[in-house]
Design a protein with these regions (language model features):
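Core nucleic-acid recognition elements
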Residues: 1-234
Length: 234
């Protein structure tokens, strides 16, 4: 039943909605899938490991479902707009427009295709660059969230093309004031704890991988009390 599917999602903390759980159920019940599973010695039901793996790869953190969704937006003036994928409309399109405008002077060699972006540096060398945010993980576990963020940035240039040589890390951090003295909602860590944990996590992640952090920026604004910006790159 629908309730049974939702219970599986809740009990396993899969964070999958009914539509997603129904898709998994239909896949598992497909006759061809059942035959393949039997051929490799798997049972008819999805295992806990399979459910967990699918839930992780379908999570907002990995899949960016909000970025890909159809969004109906209305501003404070009453103007309405339907956006089919924020990512395609406002990130990929802007990049494509800039590349088109530059024409033969476009230096982009690989964009939105591999694990990191690649631009032409000179006739002999290309520059590989990967940046990403790790905001929610760092809000929950500042040290671990920041460390996994920076080593993920280390990992991706390694896996771009035939592999890149890593040179340095960079970062931008935005936090509420470390002297913040207003009430915080339940489960939110104090900005000072987030600040100190994030800085240490990025430092350890880079140094223990042998990749120095050569520059960075700090911004303090109390609007970041709800969620910090932890923006790292390699």
């Amino acid at each position: 039943s629908d309730e049974a599917l939702l219970k599986i999602s809740r009990d396993g903390m899969l964070a999958l909605n009914l539509e997603e759980m129904t898709k998994l159920q239909a896949h598992a019940n497909d006759a061809e899938v059942q035959q393949i599973r039997a051929g490799v010695g798997l049972g008819s039901e999805l295992t806990d490991v399979e459910l967990e793996a699918l839930a992780q790869t379908w999570s907002e953190h990995c899949k960016h479902k909000i970025f890909s969704a159809r969004i109906e937006y209305e501003d404070d003036q009453g103007n309405q707009e339907v956006i089919n994928s924020l990512f395609k409309s406002y990130i990929m399109k802007v990049t494509a427009d800039v590349r088109k405008a530059r024409g033969k002077d476009d230096i982009c060699l690989s964009v939105f295709k591999d694990n990191a972006g690649v631009i032409k540096f000179n006739d002999d060398w290309s520059l590989v660059y990967k940046v990403e945010t790790h905001n929610s993980p760092s809000a929950l576990d500042p040290y671990g969230g920041a460390l996994t963020g920076i080593v993920g940035c280390n990992r991706d240039p390694f896996g771009t093309g035939m592999g890149a040589r890593l040179m340095f890390n960079t970062d931008v951090f935005c936090f509420a004031s470390p002297f913040y003295d207003k009430p915080l909602p339940p489960r939110l860590l104090h900005p000072r704890r987030i600040f100190e944990g994030v800085v240490e996590g990025v430092e350890h992640g880079g140094n223990k991988s042998g990749i120095p952090t050569v520059n960075g920026s700090l911004v303090f604004d109390d609007r970041f009390a709800g969620k910090p910006l932890v923006y790292c790159g390699t």
